[in-house]
Amino acid sequence: SCFSGVLTRPLNTFVIGGFTMICTNEDTKLINEIMRDFTNITKIAAIFVNNRGKVLSQEYNFSPFCKVVRRNPAYAKRCNQCDLYGGLDATKELSSCPYRCHMGLIDFSVPIMKDGAILGFIMAGQTKTEDTTIKPILPTQTDWHDDTKLRALYRTLPVLTAEQIYSATKVLRILVEHYFPFNDAIAEEMPYEQLPDFVESERPINRPEIRKAM
């Protein structure tokens, strides 16, 4: 559960597999402060999503490219998938390895935990890189390159080196763990519904609490 002491009025409430997950006003305030400070310093975009990939915060430093992409229902669905699977990976690996989203941009995720429950994930990124070692999170990429508007917006995206990207992931994780310490030993089993087979086949999930949840 994510209750701690006297609960203030729930701001973000969502039910997963019978479990009620609540971000209190104080939780949400801290999460937004983390994202604001991180994006102000790095100029990298960030949002907070729940355990279903649903966005629960304002968009911090969002690129025009991604704003247009997420207004397309088909694209937005794949964005949510990337957010969710990126969060799963970050949780099971206990690290925040960057990945390529379905549009080819570099993103990374840091889990937010409280009292052994995962409240959600801070998703950050929306950058380009020439580094070819960062792999896609989904098995197929979205074919968007015939869209003239998206091509023009893509050219305006920031380009980071691999070192800059990995430094950003480290900074965000340090910020998050200062306010929301990550305790793997007491991590609650995440009550996910059945996920697509490729999540297991492409990236074997070894953490028992995630495997049981699937």
Where do the protein language model's features map onto the residues?
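Short, Lys/Arg-enriched N-terminal segments with co-localized hydrophobic residues
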Residues: S1-T20
